[in-house]
Regions:
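Alpha-helical transmembrane segments of multi-pass small-molecule/ion transporters
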Residues: 14-15, 19-340
Length: 340
């Protein structure tokens, strides 16, 4: 379904529009750079979609199973992704100064606070059922920053973006386990086991931040295998998402008007709101761009895993991840064109 020819044919004119706008940009260097970025983003999203399509087909054919997906997810989250983030911290270009790093981390925390407010407003406006409200809010709050955000940001800003996005893990897991788990469980935050915050990605992010601030570099003997292992993350994650989406009933997701409104909020309202608010006091275009780009990401696939773990509406969570992921192929380049 994901790889159906009409879907790709419909996207190709949009891609070539981005390329053609670049060609007529003229002598204005800033405008020309912006249009190049749009073309790169369209191309990157098509590449990611192709990878997801392979995973989707593998899931439909039984090559990738639920048990296999679980093992692949553990491998990515505990091995390949930490390697990629750590390599970016100690081997990438040092474009961000120490002040920029601390500011960006603070912006991510502020971004989550803003998304929590937007999610609560959506919950009140849509009159959600009590048992499903937590799932809807989580879909609105938490972006797929690692699996989709990193490759897209790297396509625009280069390898520096990988380290920049890795800083999001700090507020991500703090917000997830201090607020998200209590939200989906329906219990006060004080009853949540905060030890869960210290996941491999969280620990790697803290270590990477410390190494970056101390300007510590690794020898090639360690850096090269770390980079190679980290490169498994993007194709592995895209195939994992595609395989997971193979079990989601698309028709049911499309017919859920509340989910459609939430998808519009997640993919359109969120990046616009973040950009408008933060542009008032953030003057660095790269920092503002990274925060805006993260806000434009689809819902985190982790939400469906969390719903399953706490025996909530797992199907609803999967529908939200499916719908936002598919539509983000169009909305992410659109938001890039309009906001960055």
């Amino acid at each position: 379904m994901l790889a159906s020819p009409p879907f790709f044919v419909g996207l190709l004119p949009v891609y070539f529009l981005g390329q053609s706008r670049y060609n007529v940009a003229g002598e204005n260097g800033k405008e020309r750079t912006k249009m190049v970025d749009v073309g790169i983003v369209f191309q990157k999203m098509l590449v990611l979609l192709l990878m997801m399509s392979v995973g989707f087909a593998a899931g439909k054919l039984g090559v990738m199973t639920q048990q296999g997906n679980h093992c692949l997810s553990v491998l990515i989250n505990k091995v390949t992704m930490p390697c990629m983030l750590l390599h970016a911290s100690v081997c990438g270009e040092r474009v961000l100064g120490s002040g920029d790093v601390l500011l960006l981390t603070g912006l991510y925390f502020a971004g989550f606070a803003l998304m929590i407010v937007l999610a609560r407003l959506y919950r009140l406006a849509l009159h959600l059922a009590r048992e499903d409200s937590g799932v809807y809010e989580l879909l609105m709050i938490f972006p797929n920053s690692a699996f989709i955000g990193i490759p897209v940001a790297a396509a625009i800003y280069g390898s520096t973006a990988v380290f920049g996005i890795s800083l999001l893990n700090l507020p991500f897991y703090v917000a997830l386990y201090c607020y998200g788990v209590s939200l989906i469980q329906g219990v006060p935050m004080g009853k949540v086991d905060l030890k869960q915050i210290f996941s491999p990605l969280m620990i790697t992010s803290i270590l990477g931040l410390a190494l970056y601030l101390c300007n510590i570099r690794l020898p090639d003997l360690l850096a090269e295998p770390m980079q190679t292992i980290g490169q498994i993350s993007t194709p592995g994650a895209m195939m994992l998402i595609g395989s997971t989406l193979a079990d989601v009933p698309l028709k049911k997701a499309v017919c859920n008007w509340r989910m459609l409104l939430l998808t519009a909020g997640r993919l359109l309202l969120a990046p616009v709101a973040v950009h408008l608010v933060f542009s008032l006091f953030v003057k660095d275009e790269m920092l503002l761009g990274l925060v805006t780009l993260i806000a434009a990401m689809p819902s985190a696939s982790f939400v469906s895993l969390l719903a399953a773990e706490y025996e909530k509406n797992e199907v609803l969570a999967a529908e939200g991840v499916f719908l936002t992921t598919i539509l983000s192929v169009v909305t992410i380049p659109l938001m890039t064109m309009l906001l960055l």
